[in-house]
């Protein structure tokens, strides 16, 4: 008689071994997933609030929404602009009084704009964009406004020194300067064009007119490569990001296609890696060499507004606002946020239709400490400090 149990014993052993291997693989996969989950290596705290009133619980100033925040090249001066038709200039140390001092990390300094800012310059229209001009020693600031005008201001004399109206009165969403050739600037507008201009020539023809995608979809953001070189990146309402060599702008050198809605911001993380934001509610990390998406970042709410985007290159962190009135920080390595801060201001009746975080900017210094400044639709500035966990 054949021994059936003996006959099938090896097969049974094979199944047991296979089952053990599957369990081992499942455990390893779970461990890998655990390792890939976002972890926060930073301790963040809110240190300062600068509001339009003397009390952070006072009624928000609806007409004082902050659309843009920019540190100068020394990271010691902050400029802000927005609906109030003012460029406000702040000394960073006056806002961040706790730097390099021992303090209660839960203590928050409350200031108001009137006393906190060094001075302000009134502008003829609402501002959508401001940018410090390279190699100007912090004396010149460029702006783009709702009336379609690009201007430069001499901050020492506090007067406009340059003006161009390239966009036929259509709103300018974004301005930037070339770091490769600082006399060149660019502006993107609702008219569907990016204009490249020479700041030495106030009148006459611009250097180039670029119509990304060949359509008339709004150009919402422009950024020159801050590491030098002739590349400028352009984000558009056609859901794409285009890269152009300013020496030959007939065709783009790269096209980044992956967002589902309008691209609102584009930032260089390094020479070839870019981060984009869109009202499809996500950020994307791109390799411009092959036009591939490296990673998508989700968690914040963004389906209609400009909420700001800033990258801290030393630490690999991304900051953005949100339509639910929160500040979000992502690590470039993970697709979910590593830190979220909710404002004290109430949101609207629909949960996100009232106040929202409308602008953010990292201070580009150090590696074990970081500073993020956020502006709101209520006109508040918030200063956050982060320290790397030991």
Residue ranges and their predicted role:
Residues 101-132:
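Blade-loop segments of beta-propeller domains
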Residues 358-390:
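Blade-level signature of beta-propeller repeat domains, shared across WD40, Kelch, NHL, RCC1
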Residues 81-84, 143-147, 187-191, 199, ...:
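Conserved strand-to-loop turn within each blade of WD40 beta-propeller repeats
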Residues 47, 98-100, 116-118, 138, ...:
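A structural motif specific to WD40 beta-propellers
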Residues 52-65, 120-127, 165-172, 210-219, ...:
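WD40/WD-repeat beta-propeller blade N-cap
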Residues 1-64, 72, 93, 387:
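Intrinsically disordered terminal extensions that flank WD40 beta-propeller domains
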Residues 87-93, 144, 150-154, 175, ...:
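WD40-repeat beta-propellers
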Residues 70-75, 130-138, 175-183, 222-229, ...:
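Loop/turn segments within WD40 beta-propeller blades
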